[in-house]
């Protein structure tokens, strides 16, 4: 098995606690409302905490697909959230799982700094393609910006 790590950092003008609420606490309900391609996020097993399995259903290239998220850590006090994508329809055959470790912290002017570590656990020595890495980053950035946009458009959201 190969392990390939990608680090990313993005800033936001939204305060960390409010952004965490949108990205983590309210994400199951909020994300399908702000991103048309995401149809639903539902808990398959668990109570929302560590060990919970969620099914995220989305439309890509005209096809309905889904991925399974396994929640690894929910740390509201430290604004951290870790999860892994562990399977689903449309999940790459060469990948066992993709793990995400996200943490928000205070940024300039009351905003946030989001740090993300993504680990691709591949089958054999297969490496994720540059195309896959670019596509996955674009999807992640799009999700972040959509939820950030929701917070900015709804100043009473907190």
UniProtKB/Swiss-Prot annotation:
It comes from Pisum sativum. CDD domains: Bet_v1-like. Induction: Upon contact with the plant pathogens fungus Fusarium solani, Pseudomonas syringae pv pisi, and the fungal elicitor chitosan. One of its GO terms (biological process) is abscisic acid-activated signaling pathway. This is Disease resistance response protein Pi49. The keyword Cytoplasm does not apply. One of its GO terms (cellular component) is cytoplasm. Keywords: Pathogenesis-related protein, Plant defense. It holds the Pfam family Bet_v_1. InterPro entries: Bet_v_I/MLP, Bet_v_I_allergen, Plant_def-hormone_signal, START-like_dom_sf. Belongs to the BetVI family. GO terms for molecular function: abscisic acid binding; protein phosphatase inhibitor activity; signaling receptor activity.
């Amino acid at each position: 098995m190969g392990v390939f790590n990608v680090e990313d950092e993005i800033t936001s003008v939204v305060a960390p606690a409010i952004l965490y609420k949108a990205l983590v606490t309210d994400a199951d309900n909020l994300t399908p409302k702000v991103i048309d391609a995401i149809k639903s996020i539902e808990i398959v097993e668990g109570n929302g905490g560590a060990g919970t399995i969620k099914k995220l259903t989305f439309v890509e290239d005209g096809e309905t697909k889904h991925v399974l998220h396994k929640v690894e850590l929910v740390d509201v006090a430290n604004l951290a959230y870790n999860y892994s994508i562990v399977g689903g329809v449309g999940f790459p055959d060469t990948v066992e799982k993709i793990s995400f470790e996200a943490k928000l912290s205070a940024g300039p002017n009351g905003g946030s700094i989001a740090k993300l570590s993504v680990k691709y656990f591949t089958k054999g020595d297969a490496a994720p393609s540059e195309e896959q890495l670019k596509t996955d980053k674009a999807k992640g950035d799009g999700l972040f910006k959509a939820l950030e946009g929701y917070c900015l458009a709804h100043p009473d959201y907190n």
